[in-house]
């Protein structure tokens, strides 16, 4: 069964109509959003407007609803398993008819504006621990982590063993885990490495920042999809989107058009489950 997913940090902009256009044109089944500007029912109405989309909102345990998740009715059920206190993480059990259950961890970590690199590393370590505990509690090792990490794939919080431990190739992730100083750490596979720069199809990253500092990457891959090794061969497609129908989400220079839309570009991916 081919399932299509979309994640977008909306930057607190009322982009529900543009979101609905993307969802319709890409035939998205599961929608995951951060930094919404309007109530979940308004987003649900936009998703279901003009066509028989039949999207349903699935609330989490944290009633602040920093994340909102929707699924096509009858296609999949998103059962809340864990929401952390700060609202940085929600973990849902994805139930599909005739398919092994998987976990979807949706995350939005603090940015480097407010957190030092050490702070981000510690937040990632806490995130990794919460996900692993939920995997143990549910007995489900098949996890997708998706969201705005506010870190690049090479950041210690993403790549190091004590944090998310996300590696750039399937060959590495196929080892399942790595032992460091007598402690075993499970891998995530990070396919976002393959979408960096201008030798890839689509934008060079998901977030652009031009800062007057000696070290400036300009393009960043803050929005990421990580998969446990058990799911990495299920990945069929992964795109950073730069349009909503006929409307471009980027400027003529290819940067996110943050004056009209979000400063983050949405990510779309498909899994054969």
State the predicted function of each range.
Residues 18, 38, 108-110, 116-122, ...:
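Extended recognition/assembly regions associated with phosphoester-bond processing machinery
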Residues 30, 34-112:
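Structured beta-strand-rich core segments of catalytic domains in phosphoester-bond hydrolases
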């Amino acid at each position: 069964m081919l399932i299509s997913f979309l994640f977008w940090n909306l930057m607190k902009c009322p982009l529900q109509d543009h979101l609905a256009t993307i969802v319709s044109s890409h035939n998205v089944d599961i929608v995951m959003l951060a930094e919404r500007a309007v109530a979940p029912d308004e987003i649900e109405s936009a998703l279901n407007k003009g066509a028989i989309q039949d999207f349903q909102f699935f609330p989490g345990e944290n009633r602040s609803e920093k994340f909102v998740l929707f699924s096509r009715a009858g296609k999949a059920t998103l059962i809340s398993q864990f929401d952390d206190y700060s609202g940085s993480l929600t973990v849902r059990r994805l139930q599909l008819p005739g398919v092994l259950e998987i976990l979807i961890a949706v995350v939005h970590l603090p940015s480097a504006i407010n957190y030092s690199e050490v702070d981000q590393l510690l937040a990632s370590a806490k995130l990794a621990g919460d996900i692993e505990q939920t995997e143990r509690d549910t007995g489900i090792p098949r996890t997708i982590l998706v969201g705005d990490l506010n870190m690049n794939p090479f950041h210690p919080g993403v790549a190091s063993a004590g944090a998310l431990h996300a590696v750039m190739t399937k060959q590495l992730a196929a080892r399942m885990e790595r032992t460091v100083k007598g402690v075993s750490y499970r891998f995530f596979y990070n396919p976002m490495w393959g979408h960096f720069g201008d030798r890839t199809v689509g934008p060079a990253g998901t977030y652009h920042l031009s800062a007057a500092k000696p070290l400036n990457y300009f393009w960043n891959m803050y929005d990421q999809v990580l998969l446990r090794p058990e799911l990495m061969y299920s990945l069929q497609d992964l795109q950073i989107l730069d349009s909503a129908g006929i409307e471009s989400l980027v400027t003529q220079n290819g940067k996110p058009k943050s004056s009209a839309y979000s400063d983050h570009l949405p990510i779309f991916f498909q899994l054969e489950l």
